[in-house]
Structures are given as C-alpha cells and as structure tokens.
Amino acid sequence: VAEFLDLVRISSPSRREGRVARRLVSALQALGARVEVDDAGARIGGDTGNVLGKLPGSAAGAPPLLLCAHMDTVVPCETVRPVVEGDVIRTDGTSVLGGDDKAGIAAILEAVRAVREAGIPHGPIDVLFTVCEEQGLLGAKHFDTARLSARRGLVLDCDGVNELITRAPAANSVRVTVHGLEAHAGLCPEQGISAIAVAAEAIAAMRLGRIDGETTANLGVIEGGLATNIVPNRVTVRGETRSRDLASLEAQSRHMRRCFEEAAARHAVTVDGREHRARAEVRIERSYDRLEVAEDASIVRLLRDASARIGRPLATRATGVGCDANVFTGRAGLEVANLACGMRAIHTVHEWVDVKDLVGTAELLVAALAVNAAQTA
C-alpha cells in the first residue's frame, strides 16, 4: 500500500513518465533484476522508454512469465493527493488517482518481492512497464518483443478483481478534416461554407455510442474556426470506433466515413461565377487488433490453477477497452491475457481502489508464479 501511494504521487502523464520510470528502475534493481530501458520514448516524443526488468528463476526448468503494466496515466494528474479512508484509497476530487495503471505496477512489485523474500520457487520473470499506453498503446507498439524470454504472460490493466480478460475489441481511429469556404460572417455569409456546420450535419446523422453488443463509436475532439466574424473554412474531428466483431468494426467505420462525405457533398456556393464545394478528408486507420485468448490457453489454465490454489473463483470475460495485451497477443507467438487489478472509476476524478483488492491481486500473482514454477518450459 505504501508503494502504491508513493507511485500515485508521482505525476506521469503520457510522454512524461520519466520520474516514475526512474523510481521503477531502482525498485527492480533492488529486487535483483537486470534492467533495460529501450528507445521507445525517443521514437514517440517522450522522456523515457519502456522499462524491462529480467529476474532469473529459482526453479530449474520452469518457463518464464511476463508481468506487464503501464506507467502513464490520463490527466489531470499533475498533483495527486490520495486520500485514505479505511480500506479505500481515493482522490481528493481534483485529479485522477492513477490506479490505472499504478495498481497493476504495485501488485507486480509486491508479488515479485514476496516470492523473492519468502524463497518461493519461481521461473524467470520478465517485468515490463510500458509508456504511452493511454495514447494508443504506443509503448507496446514500439517494444521489441524479441527482448522477452517469456512466451506467455499477464498485463494487469483492468477494473474489477479476480477476473481475467480474454476478449477485447479491435479499434480504428477516425480523423476528419472538413474544408469549407471562409467569408465575412456579417457582410456576406452566403458566400461562405461553414465547415463547422458541415461537420455538425455529419455528426447529427451518425450512429454513435453503443452501436450493438460488440461495437462502440465516439467522436471525442472537434477543433475549428478562427473568429466569430469569419465563416469557418476548416474543422478537424477526431474519434474512434471499437468492436470485438471485425465485420461490425468495418461497417461502423464505413458509416462514419459516409456521413462526413455525404454531408460535404450537400454544400456548395458560387462566388464570382466560380463554384466552391465543401470537402471531407477522412482517414481511418487500425489503432490495434482485437484480443482473443482461448479459454483453454495455457495462460488461462495457469490463472485458474493459481486461483484454485488460494481458494478464489476466477471469471473470464470480455471488455470494451484495449490494453497492451492487444498488441502482444499473437505477436511473435506471445500469449497474453489482461488480469483485473482492482482499479475503479478510472479516467475520472472519482477514481478509487480498495486495499483488499490490491493485496488480493498480489496474492494471485504470487500463486501464479508458484504454479508456473511447477511446470516445465
């Protein structure tokens, strides 16, 4: 708990995880890990790279296991003042808490410390703390998985407890630039095409929010205009769509594109004998692939055995959010699931965690490391 409180007090927004990274390098070295920091930060414009700690195993022949969490948090996170009320740790209402994902980091460090101090046999452990997860899993995307010894593992990055996320959506980013025509808003507005009005028309016609049981869509940023007395000639819109069903993902992506293109096609003006038409540039790209881990996969069996060892039921479920496991699963033969680690009300200033959940997550990791030690590579 003390370690979690120390971590959340360190500001670490995306691309500025340097302070917490240095703290974690020292913590891993104190546990006996060989620590490397890669160049992901330089490639994405950040102040540090991904932190990888490699701990040797104490059980001969046991397979390596990956434990991963991300260092960055969403904003506001500049001054986090955690409030402890009994077993609950929450924010003071002015910032996020940072349990997403420092709850995962704290659980990993505590579990590794516990097996080392108690002399519990374990296989080699790869501990990976990534950067810029909150900005499209960028740290994981820029991490060279060939540096890992483990072929299976756990990302700790989900709300809830005693749950293993085995299914998560793929996501497409949606970036749109709507071009109109500027004009004086008071003198000759009929000679302009408002890019904001075109975008508004497109958005009004668009299906957003919960599309179906597998699919969501959101437009989260809109920017445009220079002054109130100018008909705006340009507006940009940024959003996303996610789905665990790839056909639905592509259908929603086409729908969003069509709404912008059709709205633009309806707007044209003629000025001094020349026709001007609105135009929508729509760019849709895959942000990350879906997570699909089979119910009989070895990492799922490992967690079920670990849960049984400590007398707790483990549920597997789907989620609507992506994480670093989306990047690692299936890449270079890795098998990675997402273990819930007790974070609650994430991405809000009402975020909180229960100390019992932090402890319980660490206990489950200790059990997983012990069960893994009895297996052979």
Regions found by a protein language model. Give the residues of each.
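Active-site metal-coordination/substrate-binding segment of hydrolases
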Residues: 21, 47-50, 54, 60-124, ...
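A non-catalytic alpha/beta surface segment that caps or lines the substrate-entry region
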Residues: 13-60
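Glycine/charged-rich beta-loop-alpha catalytic/anionic-binding loops adjacent to active sites
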Residues: 83-96, 177-183, 310-311, 343-347
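Acidic-glycine-rich active-site phosphate/pyrophosphate-binding loop
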Residues: 72-87, 165-177, 304-305, 337
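Metal-dependent amide/peptide-bond hydrolase catalytic core
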Residues: 195-377
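Acidic/histidine-rich catalytic neighborhood of metal-dependent amide-processing enzymes
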Residues: 93-169, 211, 217, 228-229, ...
